[in-house]
Amino acid sequence: ALSVMSSFNDFDGIPVSGNKWLLTDILRNELGFKGFVVSDYNAINEMVKHRVAADGKEAAELALNAGLNMDMVDGDYYKYAEELVKEGRVSEKQIDRLCREVLIIKSKLGLLDDPFRYGGEGRWDKETCLPEYMEASRKVARSSMVLLKNQNDILPLKENARIALIGPAADSRSEMLGTWNAFVSSKNAVSF
């Protein structure tokens, strides 16, 4: 993996986004992870709600010192990183390391040469929605399903059986994508 996302939950009372033991000692030092860690949506600032940080500045300090490379959305790194370095609460060496780890991955992916490499008109369909990738997606979906209960042996359906899908999203391909789907076109939704 080139990137890992920290989760919202805590481990032993410390939110993962500010947990140095998990992000640095275990992930990097013990497991040898060489990529970068990104926070989940607003997870750094959520440490204030967890009551382990008094405010966004302290939350940013915890996350930076824990080894969390990238702040998704809440902006606490942007707002406070320079100030935290000036105050000596986060070392410049730590900031350099966190930035370097992100830039190494961006370089490996060719994003320093072409930052729009994986975006732009038609590139998504042409480069990522290839038939072999779509088939791999179907295979993953099929093999990851688990039937927890099969009351009255209703499954598998008999060949001549019919089912009804009812509700406002019953015939909506875009609903198969769910939330947080970025820029995926519903025509590329994988179903079987």
What are these regions (language model features)?
Residues A1-F192:
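Glycoside hydrolase catalytic-domain context in secreted enzymes
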